[in-house]
C-alpha cells in the first residue's frame, strides 16, 4: 500500500523545542509551578485572550491565586473533587490550576449534558462542589439533588440580568488591591488533578484519572509535536472537558510561555473571522470540524490570517489540499491519543509526514526523556510483524492513573504493563502506524466518544423496542454517524422519528442517531451478546435505513 509522503522544511529562525522550554526555571512537573515560573519570568506577556478580554501571565497568576483562596474558603482540600460545567471560559483555566494547587481534582462535564448524564458523573465522582456557568446551573442543581452530602454551588461568572440564580453567587470576586492569601500549596506532581469521564463499552462513562505530571508532560510533548514557539498564539475551539484543550492547547501554551486564545465553542461561521482578528498561529481540531470548514461558503474565509499549523486526527488528501492551497495553512499534523494516553503518536513536524498515518511514537523536547513505546499484538498478546494488523499497545509516562473507583476495568485495560487501546492498527517498515478500526463498541462522532452500549440501553428502554444495536457508519464530515438497528416488540409499532424523539428526550443531541433501520432479528453470540462485528459488514442495513439527517 502506498501513501503520500512529504517533508516541509522548518521556517528560518525556528526555535528548537528544548530551547523553548529551557528559557524558564524548573517547575518540578507541578501545574501551579508551571504557571508561576512563566509569570515570574514574563509577567507582562499576554497569556490568555477571551473575546474582548486579555490576561497577562501576571493576571492569570493573580486570578488563579484568588480562585485558590475562594476554594480554600469553601473547605476544598487535598483529594476533593469539584465539578466544572461550562463552555470554554477563563474561569476554567483558573479553577483547574487553583484546584491542583489545593491538591484537589477538577471534574469537567459537557455543558450540553442533560440531567441524567450529569447526575451519573457527579454522583460517581462524589463531587463536594460544582462551579457552573449561569446557563448550566439549573441542570447541575437538578442533577445533584439528593446527593449526600449535598455539594455547594458557585457560578463561574456573575449571572446576566434576567437569568435566575437564586442564592448562588460567583465563586470569587476580589476587587483590585485586595491581598490574595491562598495558603500554602498542597498539591504536587503525583497528585490526581483531573477526572475526565469517557464513554466505555460498559455503557457507563469511566472516570479517567490523571496526575499533574501527566498534564505538564503532555504540554511539553505538544511543544515538540507542533514545534510551538514562544510567540505562538494557540487558538482553542475544542471543549475543555476533553483531553485536547487541556493537555495540548492550554498546557502547551503555558509550557512555551505562549498565548492561548480561548473561544467558548467551535463556530464554523465565525472561525476565520476569529482567526484573523486574533492573529492566531496554531489550532487543534477534529475531522468533523475540518470537514465543516471545507464546506462553508468561501466568503467567510479571511485572507491574510496568521494560522500556519493545525493538529488533529488523520486528514484525507482533499483536506490537505483545501487547507494548504485554499486556506494557506501549510502544516497539518496528524496524531493519535486517548483520554487514557494523551498524545501517544504523531506525524513528525520536523521529518517525513505520511498522509493519513497516525505517525510515529511521540517524542519529548529532551531527547534523554523517552515518551511513547508502541507495539502491535495478536489476540494472544504476541507481537506481530510489520504490515500485519493487530491491537495497538502503548507504554508511556503520560498514562492515566486508572479508572476512578473501578479497579476491575483498570486491570482489564493493561497486559504486562502495556495499555490496550482497543484499536486495530498496523506498522509499516519505517515505524509509522496506521489506524484500521476499533475493536471496542465506541462510535466516534465529531470528536466525541459515544458508547454504543449506552445507546443500546437507552433505546432498548423505549416501550415498543425489544432490542437495539448502535453501529458506526461513515460520516460525510469524517469520523462516524450513528445507525440504530431496532427490533420491535411483538405487536408494537414505532417510526424512525419516534426513536429519534426518544433519544432527544433521554440523550445529548450529539448522541441522537442519524439512521434508523428496523430489523426482524439481531445476530447473537452463544452468550447472548449482539454480534455487532457481523452487522458492521452488512451494507444492506444502511441501504434500508431511514436517514433522519435529510
Ranges and model annotations:
Residues 3, 73-74, 101-172, 298, ...:
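Structural core segment of the AMP-binding/adenylate-forming
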Residues 23-28, 32, 36, 44-89, ...:
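Conserved AMP-binding/adenylate-forming core of the ANL superfamily
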Residues 43, 154, 176-197, 204, ...:
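Conserved pre-ATP/AMP-binding loop-to-beta segment of ANL
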Residues 56-58, 193-217:
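Conserved AMP-binding A3 loop
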Residues 113-114, 130-132, 337, 391-396, ...:
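AMP-binding/adenylate-forming catalytic core of the ANL superfamily
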Residues 216-233, 241-281, 296:
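Conserved AMP-binding/adenylation subdomain of ANL enzymes
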Residues 277-285, 294-355, 373:
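Gly/Ser/Thr-rich phosphate-binding loop
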Residues 349, 353, 365-371, 380-412, ...:
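Conserved ATP/PPi-binding loop(s) of AMP-dependent carboxylate-activating enzymes
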Amino acid at each position: 500500500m502506498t501513501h503520500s509522503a512529504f517533508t516541509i522544511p522548518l521556517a528560518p529562525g525556528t526555535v528548537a523545542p528544548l530551547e523553548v522550554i529551557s528559557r524558564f526555571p524548573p517547575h518540578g512537573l507541578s501545574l501551579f509551578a508551571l504557571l508561576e515560573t512563566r509569570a515570574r519570568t514574563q509577567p507582562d506577556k499576554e497569556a490568555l485572550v477571551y473575546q474582548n478580554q486579555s490576561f497577562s501571565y501576571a493576571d492569570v497568576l493573580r486570578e488563579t491565586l484568588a480562585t485558590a483562596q475562594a476554594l480554600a474558603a469553601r473547605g476544598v482540600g487535598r483529594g476533593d473533587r469539584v465539578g466544572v460545567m461550562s463552555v470554554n471560559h477563563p474561569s476554567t483555566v483558573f479553577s483547574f490550576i487553583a484546584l491542583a494547587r489545593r491538591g484537589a481534582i477538577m471534574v469537567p462535564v459537557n455543558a450540553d449534558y442533560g440531567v441524567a448524564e450529569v447526575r451519573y458523573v457527579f454522583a460517581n465522582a462524589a463531587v463536594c462542589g460544582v462551579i457552573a456557568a449561569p446557563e448550566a446551573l439549573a441542570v447541575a442543581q437538578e442533577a445533584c439533588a439528593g446527593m449526600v452530602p449535598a455539594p455547594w454551588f458557585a457560578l463561574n461568572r456573575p449571572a446576566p440580568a434576567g437569568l435566575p440564580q437564586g442564592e448562588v453567587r460567583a465563586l470569587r470576586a476580589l476587587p483590585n488591591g485586595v491581598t490574595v492569601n491562598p495558603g500554602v500549596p498542597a498539591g504536587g506532581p503525583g497528585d490526581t488533578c483531573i477526572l475526565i469521564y469517557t464513554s466505555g463499552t460498559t455503557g457507563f462513562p469511566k472516570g479517567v484519572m490523571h496526575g499533574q505530571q501527566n498534564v505538564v508532560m503532555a504540554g511539553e510533548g505538544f511543544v515538540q509535536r507542533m514545534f510551538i514557539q514562544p510567540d505562538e498564539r494557540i487558538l482553542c475551539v475544542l471543549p475543555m472537558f476533553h483531553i485536547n484543550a487541556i493537555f495540548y492547547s492550554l498546557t502547551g501554551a503555558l509550557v512555551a510561555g505562549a498565548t492561548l486564545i480561548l473561544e467558548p465553542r467551535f463556530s464554523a461561521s465565525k472561525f476565520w473571522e476569529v482567526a484573523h482578528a486574533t492573529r492566531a498561529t496554531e489550532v487543534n481540531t477534529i475531522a468533523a470540524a475540518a470537514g465543516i470548514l471545507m464546506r462553508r461558503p468561501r466568503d467567510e474565509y479571511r485572507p491574510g490570517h496568521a494560522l500556519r499549523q493545525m493538529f488533529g486526527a488523520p486528514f484525507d488528501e482533499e483536506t490537505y489540499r483545501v487547507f494548504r492551497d485554499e486556506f494557506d495553512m501549510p502544516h497539518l499534523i496528524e496524531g493519535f491519543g486517548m483520554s487514557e494516553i494523551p498524545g501517544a503518536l504523531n506525524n513528525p513536524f520536523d521529518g517525513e509526514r505520511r498522509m493519513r498515518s497516525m505517525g510515529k511514537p511521540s517524542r519529548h523536547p529532551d531527547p534523554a526523556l523517552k515518551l511513547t513505546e508502541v507495539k502491535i499484538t495478536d489476540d494472544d498478546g504476541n507481537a506481530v510483524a510489520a504490515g500485519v494488523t493487530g491491537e495497538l499497545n502503548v507504554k508511556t509516562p503520560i498514562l492515566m492513573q486508572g479508572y476512578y473507583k473501578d479497579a476491575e476495568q483498570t486491570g482489564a485495560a493493561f497486559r504486562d504493563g502495556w495499555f490496550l487501546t482497543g484499536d486495530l492498527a498496523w506498522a509499516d517498515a519505517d515505524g509509522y502506524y496506521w489506524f484500521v478500526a476499533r475493536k471496542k463498541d465506541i462510535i466516534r462522532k465529531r470528536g466525541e466518544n459515544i458508547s454504543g452500549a449506552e445507546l443500546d440501553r437507552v433505546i432498548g428502554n423505549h416501550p415498543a423496542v425489544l432490542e437495539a444495536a448502535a453501529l458506526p457508519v461513515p460520516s460525510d464530515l469524517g469520523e462516524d454517524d450513528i445507525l440504530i438497528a431496532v427490533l420491535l416488540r411483538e405487536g408494537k409499532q414505532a417510526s424512525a422519528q419516534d426513536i429519534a424523539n426518544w433519544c432527544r428526550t433521554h440523550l445529548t443531541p450529539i448522541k441522537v442517531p442519524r439512521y434508523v433501520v428496523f430489523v426482524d432479528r439481531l445476530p447473537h453470540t452463544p452468550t447472548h451478546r449482539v454480534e455487532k462485528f457481523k452487522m458492521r459488514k452488512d451494507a444492506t442495513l444502511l441501504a434500508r435505513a431511514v436517514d433522519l439527517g435529510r
